[in-house]
Amino acid sequence: MPPAVRFVFVIHDHQPIGNFDGVFEQAWKDAYQPLLDLLERHPGIRVAIHTSGPLAEWLDAHHPEYLDQLARLADERQIEIVGGAFYEPVLAMLPPRDRVSQIRRYTSYLERRLKTRVSGMWLAERVWDPGMAADLARAGVEWTILDDTHFKAAGLAENQLDRHWLTEGDGATLAVFPVSERLRYVIPFGTPEEAIDHLRSLAARRHGSLAVFGDDGEKFGVWPDTHRTCFEEGWLERLFTLLEASADWVEMCLPSEVVRQVPPAGTVWLPECSYREMTEWVLPPEAQEACVRARVGATADPRLAAVAPFIRGGSWRNFRLRYPEANEMYARAMAVSERLEGMRGAGDADPDMLERATTALHRGQCNCAYWHGAFGGIYLPHLRNAVYGQLIEADTLLDRARPNAERTGIEATVRDWDFDGRTEIRVSNGPFDAWFAPARGGILYELDLRAQRHNLLATLDRRPEAYHAEVLAGPGVARSIIDASQPAKFKEEGLDRFVRHDPSRRKMLVDHFWDVEVDPAAVADGTAWERGDFATGAYEAAVRQSDSRVEVVHSFPTRRSSDHRKSVV
């Protein structure tokens, strides 16, 4: 007879490309290592652990004993190693070739380093797109986990989410596990007893139910106050002890065991989705606030509760709409990926250089710098700089991949580089890459120093965020953007003084026309009145090129006899 409840517990540990060594070290000390040591003391607790590629490489260099411990616990079948895309990209932003390559390369790394078989994967930010199923299956993935939000958006009821399902794409199938939002909030922010009560309610509803927890390992030691809660005060110890005491009716299972031993509930085709909070963060501030109000109101109204699961926000892809800087990084990565694929197909490039360029491209696709939610994300300059550094490195390696193919002259390429339906201009030589956007104020939006692997214009505009209302409200009034039932915590006083918004891009060659007596403070905080729309208007561009010289001329049409022009040589 099957157990009353099978409990699958999945932990996702990640630090992004470009994060500081001290952050890696502190996270290992406060969360990753204490959890493994706690598991050693509770052999009855079986979990699946995903360690992202950037973190695994750092651990192998700084704490190889941690990976050795993972390998031993995997060999003892107390834990299952979960694969993924190597450098933790959101797969929705990758072409299929890069999705498959990232997954296969990381599976090979994990199986070689940890000497274990990898059958499942963690999807970064649990961002799902229906077109992924075939790519994941082609990469050898047998199962993954997604939020119950995805399943509810497909029309499944709560009582259908106590089992795993299949999904399908292009004739290939994949097992998918629904992660309980209730358990995500209870562990570790409720009490251990609440988690057990939830499992008990599943057992009462249907014998043989499956419960799935899956969330960030940083919740157990890195997030504010969680090291004290989870380890010093013994929250996790209490949970594990309660689970071991409940072994007569709760069976801790590894995901691959469930896939092998338990028939799926059926096949479901899931819509594009992520976890609930992510679908809200991607919306503009006003829409975000409206979406949250609608969801909370519907959940609280018995007449509307049935439709509440269908109230969700937007597509993860639209972070590229919210933040043009994210789209600039994405477009840069796509340009590298396209060039790399073309050189592979030509067959005359150095395979070692292509391999190194692939690694650099994959590192430049690490997701954290491409969006913003509860944590810094795209607002962190060291993450943006790291992405550009890797993408510039990849381009440089591709330059060297063909014999005698180093860039010696200067060239201009005109095309729609950023997918906005308008042309941009890329001017390149050995030391520099310059990218112009005539239709967006004639700005220079990227300037790469190739030898330094650095984009001087990896800047970020100041723009409205939904939580700015909480910042302006101040301590004692503001609510947490993660859980509105909790007060917001302020790291410093006077943050409201820094809430400013830019009326134009923070780039180069932006033409501003202010009155002579303009207040410099008004210029700095973005409130100075401008005469004309030269900073944001559409310029006409002409490129004049010779063997040793490229001139880009921007003309701004006016009603007067002469146009406003700017020229870059």
Task: Identify the function of each model-found stretch.
Residues D98-E125, A172, R200-D215:
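CE4/NodB-like, metal-dependent polysaccharide N-deacetylase domain
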Residues R104-N159, K219-L239:
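Catalytic domains of cell-wall/extracellular-matrix polysaccharide-remodeling enzymes
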Residues Y32-L39, L67-A71, V100-L110, A133, ...:
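Generic structural signal for well-ordered alpha-helices
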Residues F86-V90, T149-L156, Q160, V176-G190, ...:
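Positively charged, amphipathic and often flexible ligand-engagement surfaces
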Residues V5-P95, S101-Q102, S119-L123, E142-D148, ...:
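Short, well-structured secondary-structure segments
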Residues P2-Q33, E40-H42, Q160-L174, P178-R182, ...:
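Active-site and substrate-binding clefts of carbohydrate-active enzymes
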Residues F556-S561:
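Short, small-residue-biased leader/transition segments that mark boundaries at the very start
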Residues E25-K29, R97, S101-R104, G430-R544:
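Acidic-aromatic substrate-binding/catalytic surfaces of carbohydrate-active enzymes
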